[in-house]
Design a protein with these regions (language model features):
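Active-site-proximal inter-transmembrane loops
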Residues: 138-154, 260-263, 312-320, 325
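Long extracytoplasmic/lumenal interhelical loops at the membrane interface
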Residues: 264-278, 286, 290-329
């Protein structure tokens, strides 16, 4: 039995990095690898995983959130179809905790996993730029040309979420001496990544998330005083980049138009979100403490729509993770999610690792901003990214610097 555990642990040492390599590229295959990792965890499980020092506050809050989801199945009015959808989505909270425990026990896996993800995202970034001139068989978009929107896997929002983090990783990899070749490479990656969001994508969300990540990077890397100088420079750079991008100029103009007509056109991107922000609090007000139960949003929100035929359009999610938790799990769910976010910032603040603390703070800021305009923990690929990267970075930041 000991030999089986040792061989399983050795195999998992490469399966876990494979998971981080695959989820940006191939969700189906990454889920197969995830299943193998969970089986391997069960095979190698021992009392060491239960020791107090292996657990962190983010892990505790994730388990508490999943417990609330489980309890919510006892009083929800939603049919099993919607309950099962939410259980499958939020089971990733537990999977993330499993990864935290594995990374804590096997710290040598941490860099493998991080570099596996970076390798995948470099492939995505290069492919995005090649899309300007070539039709790539693996790319989601097939129309070459500058001034068009290009993305490789999934959708442009998900790609921009992960590229925003890649830009922060690239900037955090720049070290003294400043003129080294590696620094030039990472600066090039950061520029290409940022421009792919501002010039090669039709989405506005990516720009907001990029700003959130960069502000966190500046705050952690430079401190408050330098941030006062750097922030205006960052705003000017982003404004200049947006002004030079015909794609973003059109999207911003469209956004202003949608905002002005938000009460008249609830099917536009901005109008849809504004309508959700008006009606979801009404649903929450009916059961503000514990919510309506797991999956209840998908059916109960239809009672508040102006037109019944809109139900299938608005029932999938609320375009706001806080409202989503509030509808199903009330103030309890929202506070647990806030506690998770705060605990991530605290882990980063107390960390001795210069790069890892920047990455965790930026990841948390990107998640926070994304949660205000989307439901990232309900989205398949986004939840993989946020929860699994969260697990990795929490483990990295909790390791002694000597390791």
């Amino acid at each position: 039995m000991i030999a089986i555990r040792q061989k399983t642990a050795a195999a998992m040492g490469w399966l876990v990095p494979a998971l981080f390599l695959l989820f940006p590229l191939a969700m189906g295959l990454s889920n197969v690898v995830l299943l193998l990792v969970l089986i391997g965890f069960a095979v190698t499980f021992n009392a060491g995983y239960l020791k107090r020092e292996t657990w962190s506050w983010p892990a505790i809050w994730l388990m508490a959130l999943f417990a609330v989801v489980l309890i919510g199945t006892l009083y929800t009015p939603a049919p099993w179809h919607w309950v099962s959808v939410n259980l499958s989505k939020y089971a990733k909270f537990v999977y993330a905790v499993v990864l935290m425990l594995l990374f804590a026990r096997f710290p040598q896996w941490q860099k493998r996993a991080l570099w596996a993800f970076v390798t995948a995202m470099l492939f995505v970034l290069v492919s995005t730029w090649l899309n300007v001139w070539l039709v790539l068989p693996w790319s989601a978009t097939k129309t070459p040309g500058w001034g068009l929107s290009h993305h490789v896997f999934g959708d442009y929002i998900t790609q921009n979420v992960m590229v925003s983090f890649l830009v922060v990783f690239a900037l955090s990899s720049v070290q003294r001496p400043w003129r080294s070749r590696s620094n030039l490479f990472w600066l090039l990656v950061a520029v290409l990544g940022a421009v792919s969001i501002t010039h090669l994508s039709s989405g506005r969300t990516g720009v907001l998330l990029l700003l959130a990540g960069l502000v966190s990077w500046m705050l952690v890397r430079w401190g408050g005083k330098k941030l006062l100088i750097g922030l205006p420079v960052l705003v000017l750079l982003v404004a200049g980049a947006l002004a030079s991008s015909s794609v973003m100029r059109e999207r911003i103009a469209l956004g202003w138009s949608e905002f002005a007509k938000r009460d008249l056109d609830v099917m536009s991107s901005v109008g849809h979100r504004a309508y959700n922000y008006r009606i979801v609090p009404k649903l929450i007000a009916e059961s503000p403490v514990v919510g309506h139960g797991t999956g209840a949003y998908h059916t109960e929100i239809c009672r508040f729509l102006d037109k019944p035929e809109w139900c299938d359009i608005f029932r999938w999610h609320s375009h706001n993770q806080f409202l989503f938790f509030g509808a199903d799990h009330g103030l309890v769910g929202v506070l647990l999610y806030v506690a998770l976010l705060v605990s991530l910032y605290l882990v980063a603040r107390r960390s001795e690792h210069p790069q890892a603390r920047v990455l965790l703070a930026s990841l948390t800021s990107i998640l926070l901003v994304d949660s205000m305009i989307n439901t990232p923990l309900f989205s398949s690929r986004e939840s993989h990214f946020f929860l699994f990267m969260m697990a990795l970075l929490v483990a990295m930041n909790r390791q002694p610097l000597s390791r």
